[in-house]
Amino acid sequence: MESFEKLEKLLSYSFKNKELLIEALSHPSLRQHHEYKDDKDYERLEFLGDAVLNLVITEILFRNFANYNEGNLAKIRSYLVCKETICMVGAKLTLKNYIIMTHGEEVAGGRDNLNNIENATEALIAAIYLDSNIETTHDIIENLWAEFIKVQNLTDYDPKTALQEWAQASDHHLPIYRLIKREGASHSSTFTVLVKVKDYEQTGTGHTIKEAEKNAARSLLHRLKND
């Protein structure tokens, strides 16, 4: 696990209460392990962080997209707070290197588990909020999400349509979507879909196949614009 100082530099924020930072990065698996005395993990902070993130992103969109109606703002917000975007922010922070987890969780692939990265990212937002104030948290979120907010000129329409139009304009075959994984119980499944256009491919997850396809298309569009 890397030094928290590196993470604080990436955030441009130094925690006054380091215990909050540790709690935000503590995986729930620690509670079942006898070597760890503290029963705190990131689950409660993740709950708060989800709400803080939604509030801040909503305010940013309301302020910066004055000509967009409620429906378009909701579509953009949905993209900015979806698992894929949150995990891309977590990847920018190399957050997987800082999550504190049991050896068993790590061996099982816990550092690359998107749920863990998403939850820790949201918990980190809550920890910053509790350690500082809403204004500081707002500035940090706006900085971390800046590149994704700029992309939002393309989200007036469905990302699957946008990807199809890109493929046609580039003389490629139409995108092909393939379900590659289904996890969880039938009433709370998570689907993973792979989308492929020529030699480009990307995955997306969602609670429905349709949502997973949209998220895969969004991720691939984001990649294409940065290549």
Curated annotation (Swiss-Prot):
Compartment(s) where it occurs, according to its Swiss-Prot or TrEMBL record: Cytoplasm
Catalytic activity, EC: 3.1.26.3
Pfam families: dsrm, Ribonucleas_3_3
InterPro entries named in the record: dsRBD_dom (IPR014720), RNase_III (IPR011907), RNase_III_dom (IPR000999), RNase_III_sf (IPR036389)
Active site positions: 50, 122
Boundaries of every DRBM domain copy: 158-226
GO (cellular component) term, any one: cytoplasm
Biological process, per Gene Ontology: mRNA processing; regulation of gene expression; rRNA processing; tRNA processing
Keywords from the UniProt entry: Cytoplasm, Endonuclease, Hydrolase, Magnesium, Metal-binding, mRNA processing, Nuclease, RNA-binding, rRNA processing, rRNA-binding, tRNA processing
Family from the record: Belongs to the ribonuclease III family.
Assembly description: Homodimer.
Name of this chain's protein: Ribonuclease 3
Native organism: Rickettsia conorii (strain ATCC VR-613 / Malish 7)
Taxonomic lineage: Bacteria, Pseudomonadati, Pseudomonadota, Alphaproteobacteria, Rickettsiales
Gene: rnc
